Amino acid sequence: MFHRIEEALEDLKQGKVVIVCDDENRENEGDFMALAEYITPETINFMITHGRGLVCVPITEGYAERLQLEPMVSHNTDSHHTAFTVSIDHVSTTTGISAHERATTIQQLLNPASKGADFNRPGHIFPLIAKEGGVLRRAGHTEAAVDLAQLCGAEPAGVICEIINEDGTMARVPDLLQCAKQFDIKMITIEDLIAYRRHHETLVTREVEITLPTDFGTFQAIGYSNSLDTKEHIALVKGDISTGEPVLVRVHSECLTGDVFGSCRCDCGPQLHAALAQIEREGKGVLLYMRQEGRGIGLLNKLRAYKLQEEGFDTVEANEKLGFPADLRDYGIGAQILKDLGLQHLRLLTNNPRKIAGLQGYDLTVTERVPLQMPAKEENKTYLQTKVNKLGHLLNL
């Protein structure tokens, strides 16, 4: 059904267009994609004629800084946190909307001699800033375009355009397959691009391994660093996990207030202890402790969210009030650590279906969801109910 990443790379190097699809549980969309370095008016015209979506230019942070491209909004509330900058036209264009002038703007965006003052704002080209680490950090079209450009040895920038059907509806996989056949275009998935990158590179480094006796039993503690940020993560491993059988795994995001201080606002501490105890009972398993405090927003922002909850907001509303998504956690680094440990098939200790989807998007297989429900307390009943109602957690309250 889909083409190999290597096939798409060969076409992109020749200046051709490919179709890139994301996960059905995400946007479930396909975009035309070409290398910005080889963009022509003809390619732009093809995209806007047959794609009908918005023409965007995924770039690295370096381009945005050099050209002084500020974020489009101060607080990004997009559900996928797409990092739009201000839209631009090159000063040499007139209206900036024609295929020729849009191609000119893109070409000048890549010109190393260009400066921020060389572009009018707003305009008709929409730059998007890709996250460092690409699809291993965020499985979006923005990151896919920059990754593909880099894999081609080209300037790290792409041109993308969503594909919309003639009736105005979004093109899904059956429509995209027909489109690819009609125009003889290679079609790939972001999932396959993730797998390709995972096969060829890694972002985590195993730094140190020790024996760690705990109140729950003795584990091997393995410390990891990563090349995306300064966060350090730790895996507690019990027994022989190299047999190829599904392994009991808990991916636990750091919660200082719950894990260390025993906060009753959440169930994190009891979940951590219960997971360690269950792994010890089974004699085999992994607890991966990820430094993603407050579902990824950090300790101080979590405390600010708690303050808003005291004023009547729930946990999701508090995050959004602070300008964050409900859940900012990233599973790419955790997935790489689990792969480094030799794991492929997981029995995942979780109540969160999104965690399952997040890990499976990185070439891991969750063979079983193992519930990890703790008794509710008066102080966290509302919090847990919100996780059920708004975050889709599987709890019996």
From Swiss-Prot:
NCBIfam families: PRK00393.1, PRK09311.1, ribA, ribB. The record marks 124, 162 as: Essential for DHBP synthase activity. GO terms for molecular function: 3,4-dihydroxy-2-butanone-4-phosphate synthase activity; GTP binding; GTP cyclohydrolase II activity; magnesium ion binding; manganese ion binding; zinc ion binding. GTP binds at residues 250-254, 271, 293-295, 315, 350, 355. InterPro entries: DHBP_synth_RibB-like_a/b_dom (IPR017945), DHBP_synthase_RibB (IPR000422), GTP_cyclohydro_II (IPR032677), RibA (IPR000926), RibA-like_sf (IPR036144), Riboflavin_synth_RibBA (IPR016299). SUPFAM superfamilies: RibA-like, YrdC/RibB. Pfam families: DHBP_synthase, GTP_cyclohydro2. It comes from Bacillus cereus (strain AH820). This is Riboflavin biosynthesis protein RibBA. GO terms for cellular component: cytosol. It catalyses: D-ribulose 5-phosphate = (2S)-2-hydroxy-3-oxobutyl phosphate + formate + H(+); GTP + 4 H2O = 2,5-diamino-6-hydroxy-4-(5-phosphoribosylamino)-pyrimidine + formate + 2 phosphate + 3 H(+). Catalyzes the conversion of D-ribulose 5-phosphate to formate and 3,4-dihydroxy-2-butanone 4-phosphate. Catalyzes the conversion of GTP to 2,5-diamino-6-ribosylamino-4(3H)-pyrimidinone 5'-phosphate (DARP), formate and pyrophosphate. In the N-terminal section; belongs to the DHBP synthase family.
